[in-house]
């Protein structure tokens, strides 16, 4: 199993948790981004640099991931594609996206996008809290235990 990270928007503290987990459990971790990243020297961690452009990292991830791989992303359409490909998608806040909740999340995203297009200020996500960081670490550990 492999952990894929939509790395351009992934918070540093979440990447740090992922680095430690990959090294501790000998799990492959692939960071996909359109900018250069720094990461620990480990045979289990690598990065893929994609061209700058709309959804380039997303397309790379969905074309290379396998069923049961874990994808870390806050991008709802990417999470939906991962689910279709029988992967597991998790947000940097530790929320699991599933076949049961992804349609609702896509609808909410589309509504917010329409509001922004109409000039409404919808605001972005709040900063990651300590509780959300813990939720992410716990959800990741559960996946690692199940996948081994």
Swiss-Prot record:
Q: Which InterPro entries does this entry report, sorted A to Z?
A: UPF0178
Family annotation (CDD domains): PIN_YqxD-like
Q: Which domain of life is it from?
A: Bacteria
Family to which the UniProt record says this protein belongs: Belongs to the UPF0178 family.
Name-wise, this protein is UPF0178 protein LPC_0108
Q: What is the lineage of its organism?
A: Bacteria, Pseudomonadati, Pseudomonadota, Gammaproteobacteria, Legionellales
